[in-house]
Structures are given as structure tokens and as C-alpha cells.
Amino acid sequence: MNRPILACIFLSALAPLHAEPVFASFPLTASRTLSTSDRILARAFKTKTSGFMVKFQGTVIRKLPDDIDGSRHQRFIVRLNSGQTLLIAHNIDLAPRVSTLKTNNAVTIYGEYIWNSQGGLIHETHHRPDGSKGGGWIRYKGVIYQ
């Protein structure tokens, strides 16, 4: 008689684990005060959505070596207030390098989100080579790199 009751209690205790908030993958600050862009990026990560332009702000947490295969890209990792991390791939054949970039500094970025299992990738942070309007950018210490 005690076994069914224990099983119900055990299963009831596990039930909340299945009702994850959007920010469950990023437990650092699962807060309702997150920016709209942090919420959009968290949802995109959770649903494996890619291919949309987004503007967001984050903190540079790591500088990586440039990717020099094909088009050259300056690479660094940004952490959002949600705790989600994004790899930034900034095409330095089309836009100037963010040469003064330092870790622990804020950066605002407008680029295209591509899903990956580590939080996502942002690219297209440059002007459009065909001269059309649009394109992305990086704002760092008041300077726009496009």
C-alpha cells in the first residue's frame, strides 16, 4: 500500500522539472526583467530557430583567435544578462576590426542569429557589400563598426 503513495509523491516531485521556463538553459539570471532581445534569443535557442536579425547588448567574456579560412572573421564570445552565450563572427574583410575590444566590457550588436548547441552564433555584423540598406553592426565604446 505504501509503494503507490511513494511512487505518486516521487512522480509529483519530478513534475516541475518538465515545466521549464524559456530561460532554463541559462540559469545565471532567470529573471522577468530581461530585455526583449534576451527573451527572443533564449526562445530561439530553445526552439532551434535561426536566420533572423536581432539587436542585443552583452558583455565580452572571451576573445578568440581570428577565423582565417575563407573570409576573415574576428571572433569573440558575449554573455547576455540571461546567461546565454553567443559566438560573434565579425567579418573583417567587409568591416573594420574592433581593435580595442576587451573582456568584461559591454557591447551592442545587430546581426543574424544562427542556432548552435552552445547558445548561438551571430554573424552579418557588417554593411551589405552590394551597397543596399540594412546590414548589421557592432557598437563598442560609442564607435560603430560596420
Tell where the protein language model's regions lie, with residue ranges:
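Positively charged n-region of N-terminal signal peptides that target proteins for export
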Residues: 1-4
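Bacterial N-terminal signal peptides
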Residues: 8-16
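OB-fold and OB-like single-stranded nucleic-acid-recognition modules
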Residues: 19-146
